[in-house]
Amino acid sequence: MTKISSLLTTQVIKIPLEAEDKDELFTELVQVLINAGTLPAARRAEAEQVLEAREEKMSTGVGGGLALPHGRLANLEAPLLALGIAPNGLEYDALDGLPVNVVLAIFTPESDPEAHVQILTEVSHLFLVPGLVSRLSACHSSVEALELIKREE
């Protein structure tokens, strides 16, 4: 199984998020991937649309302060993740009605549905760790957040 920490670098972790709503959030997380050089800027609109289309089906705010917007992109060689932390919470229309503090955007290759399921499975196992969302919410740097994830995997 792929460890989530192996798909994250400090360059794809944004603390604090600046977005004030879900639309701004998707734009911000896609920009994080572009700034890190893992997603070409020419694919910005496509990546945002993939997240928005998934969100229209059902909120990816899974509850407990966590949101997992995700989707599959054509012509992607490997999975891409971007982690954003909103210490004060962000309105997200989560399933429990509460704001989210931790958002992990996940893009997987359209040609590899197994990778998509595998990563979502690994993420769900990781976030079963009691108190992880609140501890991530308290992180002040991307280094601190990545180290916490590595310790808990």
Enumerate the predicted regions with their spans.
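Cytosolic covalent-transfer regions centered on His/Cys nucleophiles
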Residues: 1-153
